[in-house]
Amino acid sequence: MANKIKAEKGLSTEEKFKEAARIVFTKKGYAATKTRDIAEQAGLNLALLNYYFRSKERLFEIVMIEKVQQLFAFMAPVLNNPGTSLYEKIDLITPSYIDMLLKNPDLPMFVLSEIKSNPERFGKMIQANNILQSSFMRQLAEEKKDVNPIQLFLNFLGMMVFPFIVKPVLQTIVPMNEDAYVQLLEERKVLIPQWMRMMLE
């Protein structure tokens, strides 16, 4: 077990549990994580964790929602920046998005589950309307006038997210350890902007 959350950080009890959950969920994945693991990581009592969050599912939901909001908090200024070109936006978003997903491998499945169970809440959470009206979407429309910009945006997003969704299947089909998988994604940081340029020609 990694070092416990230090008391001197000055975090509240709730924040200690959330930080511990981020560490353990990332390390072990949702299915293999037990609430006891999180309590031990936080250096706090299991009963206290149950008092604050009631269940592993609830804690996971809170932590992942914060991660989604952090992601789109980063993306929004990039998508809406009129001072950068379309290709500069693509070059900025691609590596940052992939790096974030590498640090939070359970996030794509959480997002899919959240979209299925509560699409309206998820749309509000990521401010979907702001994305559709962003400078990025306008630039896509201007660059490729004969294609709906939503099609291009879905391609862009899918090329980054899909490898994380199919990882378990991929590793059963292709002999691939974790290092090889990460290397595959490092290559996609370069390839995805190239593929987007080809689509936009």
What are these regions (language model features)?
Residues 1-12, 19:
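N-terminal intrinsically disordered/low-complexity leader segments
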Residues 99-138, 177-185:
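Short secondary-structure transition hinges
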Residues 77-103, 107, 144-153:
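Hydrophobic alpha-helical connector segments
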Residues 2, 134-149, 159-201:
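C-terminal peripheral helix-coil segments that are non-catalytic and often amphipathic
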Residues 94-97, 111-114, 156, 160, ...:
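Short alpha-helical scaffolding segments that buttress acidic/His motifs in well-ordered protein cores
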Residues 63-91, 130-140:
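Amphipathic alpha-helical linker/stalk segments
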